[in-house]
Amino acid sequence: MDYKKVIAERINKIVDMDVEALYKIIEIPPKKDMGDFALPCFQFAKVLRKAPNAIAEEVCKKIDQSGFEKVENLGPYINFFVDKADFAKETIESVLSERDNYGRSKVGEGKKVLIEYSSPNIAKPFHVGHLFGTVLGSSLYKIFSMEGYDCVRINHLGDWGTQFGKLISAYKRWCDEDALYKDPIKELLRIYVKFHKEAEKDPLLEDEGRMYFKRLEDGEKEEVELWTKFKDLSLREFKKVYNQIGVEFDSYTGESFYSDKIDAIEEELNEKGLLTESNGAKVVMLDEYNMPPCIIKKADGASIYATRDLAAAEYRKKTYNFDKSIYVVGLEQSLHFKQFLKTLELAGHEWSKDCIHVGYGLVRFAEGKLSTRNGDVIFLEDLLKESVQKTSEIIEEKNPELDNKEEVSRKVGIGAVIFTYLKNGRERDIIFDWKEMLSFEGETGPYVQYSYARAKSILRKLGEVKGNVSYDKLVSAEEFDLIKQLKGFNGAILNAIDRLEPSVITRYVIEVAKAFNKFYNAYNISNTSDEELKNARLALVEAASIVIKNALSLIGIDVVEEM
């Protein structure tokens, strides 16, 4: 039973407000003596022309209280207390019967959502900054899919632009072919960094780079062959990383795919009277929207990524007819998205409102922001290796007899990195701290994974839940707090969708793990003399393990059975 829905439907019979809006304002009170659910009455004051306190008192007298232990008003709030035995039975039985499907719904059925994420630049390393958008987008895909949306995962590769002209120039001057095939990304990075250092001394190199890119745009054989080589080698390396972190895509269609669709965009904008010439470049003026012009074509005739994004948006609408198109791209690109989406709107595409930029912060180390150009980049592969190695050392110290130490270290080490990215709101910057990240205590990935392993250990030791379960035995504060947390899973998923924020799930699973460990530390289940109570607690442990596993899967983390 969805208690919030029941409350919303009953309030709807008394107050003129639709069920969906009511559902959204129902809260979980901060204190236990305030009930299990609370409805604030402030929003009804204007419509009913009464004080919120008076409304709460009046509604409380009229509402159908069946199925609740009690309903009472406290100031401007109506507090609902559930029947604990019924609540425990309904929640735990739902989890145990639905298992991997617990939390799933059909709210998104019939709706198509595109999610563009990761989108690394070809010939540049996949560094720790790229991982943020990659795991964020992958998690959004899993969360939307869980609720029935038909999702398409797009990796909009950065495989076009003037940087490829620079890279071709650098390749011709300084590339070591043996090094290129041995470690393509590192060699391409080396020559790219060298190009920029040399260009500081010889500005004509920049002109040479632009010339090579123009030749690439014109389809010149040698330049196209080199560009294809860079792309194939880069993609091979990127896929190694994606395999490590369990990330997949339905499409790798990058910027280059839209290069032959640029002229049509220019023509469309011109026909609609939106195109203006400025210093030789073709732009869409956005002064009245307090934005700089959106450049469509540069003075040298080369296209820019805003134009390619316009072409991609139109192509995707025609191809997929999406209901929502999500762009998971760093906050640094916020202005670009405002310009591009405003241009799309001005071109008469009302569906531009369905295109959403989901921004995220920076990843920082002691040295500050990461940058490819200067070469001070931390490779993601190195970060993952170090995390797995450090985790292995911790596990060796804590449990030297553990089987499958290598696999456990890999899952926990990589999981710890992903968890760190998705723990807080996506717009916040991330600062890596190994000690905190790999700790088995506190709000970390290893802590949550250890909670799951602890639950599985109890189940292995005590066996399966037997026959009919006496849920009325689960009356303690620790037991009921855990049951309430388990009940909140679907609400957390819907909240994550509403806010486009996977950290909602991460924070949720932290709270489940905390509630589970509080319960675990309060009671020695194996020594419980009351067999009915022991069986009920065993059912609760199994339900907790299922929910922790399901929640972790939504943020892309694999569980381990032992730690």
From Swiss-Prot:
The keyword ATP-binding applies. It catalyses: tRNA(Arg) + L-arginine + ATP = L-arginyl-tRNA(Arg) + AMP + diphosphate. Its EC number is 6.1.1.19. It is an enzyme of class 6 (ligase). GO terms for molecular function: arginine-tRNA ligase activity; ATP binding. A motif ('HIGH' region) lies at residues 120-130. GO terms for cellular component: cytoplasm. It holds the Pfam family Arg_tRNA_synt_N. It is found in: Cytoplasm. Keywords: Aminoacyl-tRNA synthetase, ATP-binding, Cytoplasm, Ligase, Nucleotide-binding, Protein biosynthesis. The keyword Nucleotide-binding applies. InterPro entries: aa-tRNA-synth_I_CS, Arg-tRNA-ligase, Arg-tRNA-synth_N, Arg-tRNA-synth_N_sf, ArgRS_core, DALR_anticod-bd, Rossmann-like_a/b/a_fold, tRNAsynth_Ia_anticodon-bd. SMART domains: Arg_tRNA_synt_N (SM01016), DALR_1 (SM00836). GO terms for biological process: arginyl-tRNA aminoacylation. Monomer. Belongs to the class-I aminoacyl-tRNA synthetase family. This is Arginine--tRNA ligase. It comes from Clostridium acetobutylicum (strain ATCC 824 / DSM 792 / JCM 1419 / IAM 19013 / LMG 5710 / NBRC 13948 / NRRL B-527 / VKM B-1787 / 2291 / W).
